[in-house]
């Protein structure tokens, strides 16, 4: 439960949110490209896009990290909550309760399985070693708990509460961003989409495994884990508010590369705060509020994402056309 169980629950929660309601589904325009044009219009184009993203991130990362003061917004989220407790308390209590229940379950299993091994190794240091083993157990149980809490998006309602509290007048329930997908019966799915996703997720799991191994280092490991995944933390927090701003799934993904420095900056502070057990249960809510405030103060408009729009316009536009078989 403390390891594989948390990962399984986190994965299920993420999939439910990713393919859940509140979205309109359209085929990726690439599915209409004839197979004899794939070399130029699919493979070379995607490779060129990856190289362009890499260059852009490397050239703008550090400048972007301090643009807009993204690292201050986890604190601004706390101040917003402190100023308007009555508006946020009910939703925040539900999130905190879910965190505490999950943290208790993970801690129980962790203490029954992994803590004895740490104790056996560190007991040679005497009382200090015992203290390190116990304290690290809480830190790492918090890591596994947050994997589930973040990917399950328990904080989504809080995003809507914060937007409404800050004067959003449109009916949020009517906003349905597009989710582009590749039909399983299309050439594009088998010739590019599935192999690419398979490699991507295998590499992702490998990186996650390495990061989790790092988190096993006593005391410093869990903190390093949160620092290293800081852009991913921000991606999760920004997903809901960007959906409500009508960003489709391609634009949300592109946004990570266009603002990689801001994602890392916000996630760095949010991750450090969430490294503290129990406090993390409150920080999930205040960081959520902070992510909304950042997007309100520095709005990101889908139409300005030139590369994303060019990517879609470069392909045939009749997305209702039957894909080549």
Curated annotation (Swiss-Prot):
- Note whether Transmembrane helix occurs among the keywords: yes
Q: Which residues lie on this side of the membrane: Extracellular?
A: 113-118, 230-263
Which GO biological-process labels does this protein carry?
ascospore wall assembly
Localization per record: Prospore membrane; Lipid droplet; Spore wall
Q: Record's Gene Ontology CC terms?
A: ascospore wall; lipid droplet; prospore membrane
Q: What is this entry's stated membrane topology?
A: Multi-pass membrane protein
Spans traversing the lipid bilayer? 92-112, 119-139, 209-229, 264-284
InterPro entries for this protein: Spore_wall_assembly
Gene knockout outcome: A combined deletion of the LDS proteins RRT8, LDS1 and LDS2 fails to incorporate dityrosine and another yet uncharacterized component in the outer spore wall.
- Membrane side Cytoplasmic: which residues? 1-91, 140-208, 285-325
Give UniProt keywords alphabetically: Lipid droplet, Membrane, Sporulation, Transmembrane, Transmembrane helix
Broad class of the protein's primary localization: membrane
Q: What does this protein do?
A: Involved in spore wall assembly.
Q: Which family does it belong to?
A: Belongs to the LDS family.
User: Which PANTHER family does UniProt cross-reference here?
Assistant: OUTER SPORE WALL PROTEIN LDS1 (PTHR34292:SF2)
Q: By what name is this protein known?
A: Outer spore wall protein LDS1
Q: Which organism is it from?
A: Saccharomyces cerevisiae (strain ATCC 204508 / S288c) (Baker's yeast)
Q: Which gene encodes it?
A: LDS1
